[in-house]
Structure formats: C-alpha cells, structure tokens
C-alpha cells in the first residue's frame, strides 16, 4: 500500500492536478491507523481472554491430574488394605481351623476315654465274675469255720441288739447309697446325653462358622471383583483423560496457529482495506479530474470550433495561433490516455484486492467455524470431565460404603467368634467338670459295687457255712441218738431227773425262741420304718439335684436304646447282686428250720445221766413236733437257734468216752472258729461305718 501511495504521489507530482489529494490521503491514513490500532487492541483483548481461558483450563487439567493421582494413591491404599484384610482373614481362618482341629482332637480324646471307661467297666465286671469263682473256692475253705458260732452264743446274744441296730443303719445307708447310685447313673446318662448334645452343637456351630467363612470369602471375592472393575474404570478414565489432555494440547496448538494466521490475515486485510480505500480515493479523484478534463475538453472543443470558424474566417491571419491549439490538444489527449490507463490499472488492482478480500473472508469464516467447533469441543470436554468427576465421587462413595460394610461385617464376625470361643471355653470347662465328677462318681460306684459284691460273697459264705452246719448237726444228732441208746442200755437213769431236766430245757428253748421272734419282729419293723424314712430323705435331697441336672441346658438329646439297655442291665445286675443274698438266705434258712427237729435228741442225752425210759423217748420224739410248729417263725433266725443248741450242748455233761473226746475237740475248734469269725465281723462293721461316713461326707460336700 505504501508503495502504491508512493507511486501515486510520484505520478501526482508528475501532474499538477494530484497535489490537492495529499492532505486527504494523509487524513485517510491517520484514520486507517486509528482503526488498525483499535482493532489491534480488540484482538489483543480477545487473545488475552483466550490466554486466560487456556490458563484456567490448564489449571483445571492440573487439578484433574492431581485428583487422578490422589485417586490412584487411594486405589493403591485400598489394594493394600484389601491385601491386609485378606492376610488377616487367612490368619483367622487358619486359627479357626486349628481351633476346630483341637476341638475334634478333644472330642476324639473324650470318646476314647469314654470307650476306655466302658472297657474298664466290662473288664472289672468280668474280673468280678472271676472273683466270684475264687470266692467260691474260698467258701469251700471257710465252710469248716462256721462251727465257731456255737461256743460264743452268749456273747453274740449280748451284742446282737447292737449289731441289729448297726445292721439296720447300714441297710438304711445301703438303700440310700443304692438310690444315690441310681441317681448317679441317671446323672451319668444325662451327662452322656449332654456330651452328645455338646458334640452335636459343636458340629452345628462348626458348620455355621464354615458357612459364615464361605460367605465372607464370597463377599471378599465380590469386593475384589468390584475393586478390579473400579480400577479398570479408573484406568480407562485416566487413559481418556490423558487422551483428552493430548487432544486439548493439540487443539491449543492449533488455536495458537489459527490465532497467528488470523492475526496475519487481519493485518493483510487491514492493509488491503487501506490500499482499497486509497485506490478508491484515487479513482474518485481521477474520475473528478476526468470530469473536469472532459468539461475542459468540451470547452476546448467549443473554443476550437469557434476558433476554426474564426480561422476559416481569418484563414491566414490566424495561422500562428492554430499550431499552439494543436499542441494543447495533443497534451490534453495524452493526459486523457494516461488517465484511462491508470483507471484500468486501478480497476485491475481493485479486482485483485476484492478477490484477496473474498479469500481472506472465507479463511476468516473457516477459522471462526473452527474456533466455534473447538469451543464446542471444549464444552463437551468440560461436560465429560464433570461426568468423570461425578463418577469418581460415586466410586469413592461406593468404596467407602464397601469398606464400612466390610469393617462392620468383620466386627460382627469378630464378636460372633469371641462369643463362640467363650461358649466353647465354658463348654470345655463344663465338660471337664462333668468328666471329673463322672469319674469320681464312677469310682464311687465301683467301690460301692465291690463292697456290695463282697457283702454278697460273705453272705453266701455264711449260708454255705450254715448248710455245712446243718449236715454236721444231722451227723451229730445221729451220733448222739446212738450214744443215748448205748447209755440207756448201759446205765439206769432216774426218770424224774430226766423229765425235770428235759422240761427245763424245753421251757428255756421256748422262752428264748419267743424272745428271738419278738426281737426279729421289732428289727423288721425298725428296718421298714428306717427304709421309708431314708427314701423320703433321699427324695427330698436328690430332687433339686435332679432338677439342676435336667435344667443344665435346654438343648438335650434323648439317649439311645442301647445306652438305656446297658444302664438298665447294670442297675438290674447291681440290684440283683444286692438283693440275691437275702433270697438265698431265705431259701437256705427254710431247710435249716427242718434241721431243728433232730436237735432235741441231742439235749435229752445231755441232761440224762444213766438210763432212759420209754417216757423219755416219747418226750424226745414229741420235741420235734413242738419245734416243727415254730419252723415258719424261725426261718430268718437260724443263727439264734444254733446259739441255743450250743447252750444246751455246753450245759450237758457227756461221759468220758471216745465219742466225748471227739465232741470236746469239735467244740474247741468251733470256739476258735467263732472267735475268728467275730473278729472278722467286727472289722467288717468298722469298715462299713468308715465307708458310709466317707460317702456321706462326699455327698454333703457335693451338695
């Protein structure tokens, strides 16, 4: 533009009519400079605003990057927490498995100990049977020792009442102990049921814990899958954000390049506009000059025509002036040609500038469209960033909720596990206590069973000794009858003395038998009263214990049929072992009462001196009939009748003969045996007293 202005100025200087346009051109240039400065300030403001927007966007991108880094760190922390939780859970599962193994081992130990106890009981039962066989052999040895009861009959009568009281108390204690043993057996059965219920409950709890562990593992797997999914989404978001950042950077670079192009195009546009305006002004000035020149040409034509007419009129006179007019016309024509050529040049430049303006306007439109598209893309990116931020917030909330739920679930599991461990510890303590009490009770029952069996064996021994005494008494009665017959033939004894002695002996026997019957009735009544009182006391004592044992837990299972049968067999065996001596005694005493009939012949010869008459024989034969009437009453008092027999045998004075020496030896041996048996009975009663006191103390301590 400046070059054009310089050329125009040079051309104007070449002509005189262009000097008047310089001032206007300078004013136009000033206005153009002002316009350019104004536009420049506007464009600078816009560029500054765009730069501030870009800086804000860069800051936002930096914040987003920082947030993404924070999220990455949080995700890493979450991964570490998840790994720690997994390790803790694995450790907890290992601990639970170890505890479960310990419980299984303890249950196996309990089962083995219980089986060992059962085997020991069976072995002891078999050993007791073997002991019974050994005792039978001992009974055969001790059959001869029962004859010692004859000499010490008076001492036995004195101590009989004491022994009867002791026996009644011991029987009452025995019944109480039997009832206690039954109750203890019931308690043992209940404890077995409780052990089974504890085993079942422990198995159910183990299954419950295993199901809970499986559920926890499933939740952990689900949480891990969610965390992986969230990490994938976060990684995708990070990748998209990185791509967005790269695109934004590329777009920023393109914007900068487009801004630079716009600035260059705007500068070119300004220059073109200034050149166009200067050219339009020049064209307008050229047109004005052309119009002036045309008017001058018209005036010159008119003047030329007038002058031609005048020349024609003055042909020769005016020849000098015609040469000058033609030179002016030539100059005017040359100027007109120059103006035409300059106009053509200006029009070509105007068309060229218009084409360049159109191209610049098209490029400006394209750049503006690109800017609008970039603004829209920036808005979209902002919307996507907002969406990503919202999604990140949601993910954080979900992660926090998952952590809270996981922590609450862990706390609940820990509480449940602590509660279950406490319950298992309490159950272990209760099982240990029940084991100790059951072992103690079993030991007591074994001791009591052994004592009862020993008593039964002793009772059987006594009965066998009584049977042997029966046989010996029969043999002695036969020997005495033979001896009496020999004495009756050899010597003559006064009938009056024999009758008196015989009547006195009979009266003594009858009175003693009546006293013994009364004593037996009194002892029986006392025993019945004591048994009833002991039953009432035992019911009162053992009812609260039975309630406590039954109300030990609500969850108890019924014992099996085999256990009931086994316990019932044991109790029946125990009862039969206790009550069989009585039956055997009653069965063995019945035939002993029959032996009393031949005892009277032993008395009559003892009281007679030398001879017997038919009256004495009739009396001696009438004595068994009198004694047979009292057989039913004397079925339980064989020992007392034997004592009476010993009294009469001691009161009689046998003559010196080989039969008398045999009888004296027999009596001496029986004295020794009776003394030994009395010592054994005293020791046995003392042992029974001690054991009964111990058992009473133990039961009082348990209560």
UniProtKB/Swiss-Prot annotation:
The keyword Zinc-finger does not apply. Transmembrane segments: none annotated. Disulfide bonds: none annotated. Polyubiquitinated via 'Lys-48'-linked ubiquitin, leading to its degradation. Deubiquitinated by USP36, promoting its stabilization. Pfam families: CEP63. The keyword Flavoprotein does not apply. GO terms for cellular component: centriolar satellite; centriole; centrosome; cytoplasm; spindle pole. The modification N-acetylmethionine is found at residue 1. Residues 77-199, 242-303, 346-533 form a coiled coil. It is found in: Cytoplasm, Cytoskeleton, Microtubule organizing center, Centrosome; Cytoplasm, Cytoskeleton, Microtubule organizing center, Centrosome, Centriole; Cytoplasm, Cytoskeleton, Microtubule organizing center, Centrosome, Centriolar satellite. The modification Phosphoserine is found at residue 278. One of its GO terms (biological process) is DNA damage checkpoint signaling. Its main location: cytoplasm. InterPro entries: Cep63/Deup1_N. Keywords: Acetylation, Cell cycle, Cell division, Coiled coil, Cytoplasm, Cytoskeleton, DNA damage, Mitosis, Phosphoprotein, Ubl conjugation. PANTHER family: CENTROSOMAL PROTEIN OF 63 KDA (PTHR18875:SF7), SARCOMA ANTIGEN NY-SAR-24/CYTOSKELETAL PROTEIN SOJO (PTHR18875). Belongs to the CEP63 family. Required for normal spindle assembly. Plays a key role in mother-centriole-dependent centriole duplication; the function seems also to involve CEP152, CDK5RAP2 and WDR62 through a stepwise assembled complex at the centrosome that recruits CDK2 required for centriole duplication. Reported to be required for centrosomal recruitment of CEP152; however, this function has been questioned. Also recruits CDK1 to centrosomes. Plays a role in DNA damage response. Interacts with CEP152 and CDK1; these interactions recruit both ligands to centrosomes. Interacts with CDK2, CDK5RAP2, WDR62, CEP90, KIAA0753/moonraker and CCDC14. CEP63, CDK5RAP2, CEP152, WDR62 are proposed to form a stepwise assembled complex at the centrosome forming a ring near parental centrioles. Interacts with CCDC57; the interaction is required for their location to proximal end of centrioles. Interacts with FXR1; promoting its stabilization. This is Centrosomal protein of 63 kDa. The gene is CEP63.
């Amino acid at each position: 533009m400046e070059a054009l202005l310089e050329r125009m100025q040079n051309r104007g200087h070449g002509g005189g009519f262009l000097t008047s346009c310089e001032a206007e051109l300078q004013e136009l240039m000033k206005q153009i400079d002002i316009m350019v400065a104004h536009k420049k300030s506007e464009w600078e403001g816009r560029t500054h605003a765009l730069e501030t927007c870009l800086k804000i966007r860069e800051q936002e991108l930096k914040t987003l990057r920082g947030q993404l880094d924070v999220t990455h760190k949080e995700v890493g922390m979450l991964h570490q927490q998840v790994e720690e939780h997994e390790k803790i859970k694995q450790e907890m599962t290992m601990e639970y498995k170890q505890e479960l193994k310990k419980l299984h081992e303890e249950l196996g130990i309990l089962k083995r100990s219980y089986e060992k106890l059962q085997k020991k009981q069976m072995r002891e039962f078999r050993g007791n049977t073997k002991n019974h066989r050994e005792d039978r052999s001992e009974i055969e040895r001790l059959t001869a020792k029962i004859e010692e009861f004859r000499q010490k009959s008076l001492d036995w009568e004195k101590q009989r009442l004491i022994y009867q009281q002791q026996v009644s108390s011991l029987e009452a204690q025995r019944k109480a102990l039997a009832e206690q043993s039954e109750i203890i057996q019931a308690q043992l059965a209940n404890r077995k049921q409780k052990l089974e219920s504890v085993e079942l409950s422990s198995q159910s709890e183990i299954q419950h814990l295993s199901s809970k562990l499986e559920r926890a593992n499933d939740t952990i797997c689900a949480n891990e899958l969610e965390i992986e999914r969230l990490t994938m989404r976060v990684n995708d978001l990070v990748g998209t954000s990185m791509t967005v950042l790269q695109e934004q950077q590329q777009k920023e670079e393109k914007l900068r390049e487009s801004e630079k192009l716009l600035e260059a195009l705007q500068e070119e546009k300004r220059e073109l506009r200034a050149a166009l305006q200067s050219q339009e002004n020049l064209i307008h000035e050229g047109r004005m000059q052309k119009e002036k020149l045309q008017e001058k040409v018209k005036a010159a034509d008119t003047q030329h025509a007038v002058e031609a007419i005048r020349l024609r009129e003055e042909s020769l006179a005016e020849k000098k002036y015609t040469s000058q007019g033609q030179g002016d016309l030539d100059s005017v024509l040359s100027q007109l040609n120059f103006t035409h050529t300059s106009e053509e040049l200006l029009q070509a430049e105007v068309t060229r500038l218009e084409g360049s303006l159109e191209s610049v306007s098209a490029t400006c439109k394209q750049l503006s469209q690109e800017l609008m598209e970039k603004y829209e893309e920036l808005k979209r990116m902002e919307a996507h960033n907002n969406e990503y931020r919202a999604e990140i917030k949601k993910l954080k909330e979900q992660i926090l909720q998952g952590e809270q739920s996981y922590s609450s679930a862990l706390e609940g599991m820990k509480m449940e596990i602590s509660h279950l461990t406490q319950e298992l510890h309490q159950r272990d303590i209760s099982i240990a206590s029940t084991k100790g009490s059951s072992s103690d009770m079993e030991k007591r029952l074994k001791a009591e069973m052994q004592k009862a069996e020993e008593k039964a064996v002793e009772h059987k021994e006594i009965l066998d000794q009584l049977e042997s005494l029966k046989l010996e008494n029969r043999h002695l009665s036969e020997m005495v009858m033979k001896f009496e017959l020999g004495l009756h033939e050899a010597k003559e004894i006064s009938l009056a003395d024999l009758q008196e002695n015989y009547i006195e002996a009979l009266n003594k026997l009858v009175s003693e038998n009546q006293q013994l019957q009364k004593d037996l009735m009194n002892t029986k009544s006392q025993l019945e009263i004591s048994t009833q009182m002991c039953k009432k006391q035992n019911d009162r004592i053992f009812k609260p214990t039975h309630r406590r044992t039954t109300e030990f837990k609500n969850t108890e299972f019924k014992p099996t049929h085999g256990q009931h049968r086994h316990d019932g067999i044991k109790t029946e065996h125990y009862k039969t072992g206790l009550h069989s001596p009585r039956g055997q005694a009653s069965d063995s005493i019945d035939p002993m009462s029959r032996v009393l009939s031949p005892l009277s012949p032993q008395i009559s010869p003892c009281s007679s001196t030398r001879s017997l008459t038919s009256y004495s024989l009739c009396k001696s034969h009438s004595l068994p009939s009198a004694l047979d009437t009292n057989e039913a009453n004397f079925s339980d008092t064989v020992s007392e009748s034997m004592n009476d027999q010993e009294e009469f045998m001691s009161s009689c004075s046998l003559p010196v003969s080989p039969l008398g020496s045999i009888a004296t030896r027999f009596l001496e041996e029986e004295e020794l045996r009776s003394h030994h048996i009395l010592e054994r009975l005293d020791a046995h009663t003392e042992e029974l007293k001690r054991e009964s006191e111990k058992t009473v103390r133990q039961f009082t301590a348990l209560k």
